[in-house]
């Protein structure tokens, strides 16, 4: 394998059906420190998490297996240095919308798998545009989204909202906010520290009128 890697200059291996790195591959990792080992299963033990460079967050039928469209992925926030890429191979239609929303809410990549063992299950044009926008956001704001100070499910100030906070060492933050209700919410979202110079912009999702206001001695 070492000879094959040296001759082909490949970037890494995908460990199909696996969630750990075989002991025989450890020497490869030592000889090629930047080599990628991505597993299909999310690792569960410390050794696996340390040795694998990334893994899939693979879910089945969203409608059947999950009661909510969006939820926080705690593994992603506990181990931000271990990229998780979301995939639901058999999802179709609006279920693919849910996968994109989950990836955006948790700051996670997507596995684009459309030809599933000969079954063609494509993303539609609108979904492809959303994925492209999300990729651009991840590239532009990578150091914030994968910041070590990120926190899942911070307190929100209106009922029906959940929020993940991505936060880097330069005090830059991204709030991923999801509305659980089927109605528009007009009101405070999250509390901000009383910083003199604060700039805010929306970078993804449904266009929203965002403002910074002081409400009851809390900058919101």
Q: What is the predicted role of each segment?
A:
Residues 22-198, 204:
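Active-site-proximal substrate-binding groove within the catalytic cores of carbohydrate-active enzymes
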Residues 202-212:
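A short, surface-exposed interaction/processing loop segment used at functional sites
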Residues 213-220:
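C-terminal beta-strand-rich structural cap/linker in extracellular carbohydrate-active enzymes
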Residues 1-22:
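Active-site groove signature of glycoside hydrolases
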